[in-house]
UniProtKB/Swiss-Prot annotation:
Biased composition (Basic and acidic residues): 207-251, 352-377, 392-406
Compositional bias annotation for Acidic residues: 378-391
Binding of an alpha-D-glucoside, residues: 109, 111, 128, 135, 317
Residues making up the signal peptide according to the UniProt record: 1-17
Name the UniProt record assigns to this protein: Calreticulin
GO BP terms: ERAD pathway; olfactory behavior; protein folding; sleep
Organism whose genome encodes this protein: Drosophila melanogaster (Fruit fly)
Length: 406
């Protein structure tokens, strides 16, 4: 039995050693800008990131991240790391987003680039490998982007994944596996999964409509037909409008001046509309004709859809109308369990944030009440002063009147 335990330990050790962390960024260093490069692409008004835990948090140090700090700005900053390929291994991309400003319109996603990226010139048209994360703009756009580059073209997921739109921290996780399957998680809970070939248009369709097939001329796809024996009733045809029988010519109507008087028209209660014969089940009905399909000669399978041959840069390339988003807990790895363990901390983070925010909201509520009361008291004082002034004026008028009488 001893050898069995040894094998298990060795296997566990090998599994541990094989796990790779390509990038881990918790922004726990005041010198974070030494490793992150701002873009200087011309023609863009870029904003700056600032290191902060925000105005409400669970842990003032652990919850520090980089926050967008200027409204109506582009943001473009990236960090390079040792390049890698995810061939035959899972790829896990994870990070946290906190829209503390109650965002109205702005991106919260990351992009992964290969090593050819010029970080100082990164911009919206820079080619990337993967784009992943939340995007919000008004009530109509609240989605999680999952976009892959394939043969020089960006392909969007065909499914709609809704993102979180509150003010608290949320972890977003993308897992891509060598069997061409994927998962998207928010706060460690799976919100979408499937097959890369099924949910993206990387490849031509497997089947296409047979271009040589046509519907037979004698194919009857009418479920019902008019009853040939049904006849229109003789009294069916009635005018849609008739003269109002209750209308009378006005007394001041002058036929010579106004022309011949005609009563106004009203809807005819006996009007039945256009007559249609009754419908019968069609005895020759064959159902809806389905265009036959054939194998698409342009379809070429690819069992490497998951593969990213080179990744070595992660960047934030965003536009935000209202700033205040905090990014943190960036992790790129092939270890699914490690990512899950890191994301599990979100519950504690959210609990602490909510507790602090509720306390702040209560303080603000009391402050607003006090200010409202002060404003109300001042209005009452002003009204009293006005009443006193009116009394004084009335008294003066009375004194003047009495004086005049004397």
């Amino acid at each position: 039995m001893m050898w069995c335990k040894t094998v298990i330990v060795l296997l566990a050790t090998v599994g541990f050693i094989s796990a790779e962390v390509y990038l881990k960024e918790n922004f726990d260093n005041e010198n974070w800008e030494d490793t992150w490069i701002y873009s200087k692409h011309p023609g863009k008004e870029f904003g700056k990131f600032v290191l902060t835990p925000g105005t409400f948090y669970n842990d003032a140090e652990a919850d520090k991240g980089i926050q967008t700090s200027q409204d109506a700005r582009f943001y473009a900053a990236s960090r390079k790391f040792d390049g890698f390929s995810n061939e035959d291994k899972p790829l896990v991309v994870q990070f946290s987003v906190k829209h503390e400003q109650n965002i109205d319109c702005g991106g919260g996603y990351v992009k992964l680039f290969d090593c050819s990226l010029d970080q100082t010139d990164m911009h919206g048209e820079s080619p990337y490998e993967i784009m992943f994360g939340p995007d919000i703009c008004g009530p109509g756009t609240k989605k999680v982007h999952v976009i892959f580059s394939y043969k020089g073209k960006n392909h969007l997921i065909s499914k709609d994944i809704r993102c979180k739109d509150d003010v608290y921290t949320h972890f977003y996780t993308l897992i891509v596996r060598p069997d061409n399957t994927y998962e998207v998680l928010i706060d460690n809970e799976k919100v979408e999964s499937g097959n890369l070939e099924d949910d993206w248009d990387f490849l031509a369709p497997k089947k296409i409509k047979d271009p040589t097939a046509t519907k037979p001329e004698d194919w009857d796809d009418r479920a019902t037909i008019p009853d040939p024996d049904d006849k229109k009733p003789e009294d069916w045809d009635k005018p849609e409008h008739i003269p109002d029988p209750d209308a009378t010519k006005p007394e001041d109507w002058d036929d010579e001046m106004d022309g011949e008087w005609e009563p106004p028209m009203i809807d005819n209660p006996e009007f039945k509309g256009e007559w249609q014969p009754k419908q019968l089940d069609n005895p020759n009905y064959k159902g809806a004709w389905e265009h036959p399909e054939i194998a698409n000669p342009e379809y070429v399978p690819d069992d490497k859809l998951y593969l990213r041959k080179e990744i070595c840069t992660l960047g934030f390339d965003l536009w935000q109308v209202k700033s205040g988003t905090i990014f943190d807990n960036v992790l790129i790895t092939d270890d699914v369990e490690l990512a899950a363990k890191a994301a599990a901390e979100v519950k504690n983070t959210q609990a602490g944030e909510k507790k602090m925010k509720e306390a702040q909201d209560e303080v603000q509520r009391k402050k607003d009440e006090e200010e409202a009361k002060k404003a109300s008291d001042k209005d009452d004082e002003d009204e009293d002063d006005d009443d006193e002034e009116k009394d004084d004026e009335s008294k003066q008028d009375k004194d003047q009147s009495e004086h005049d009488e004397l």
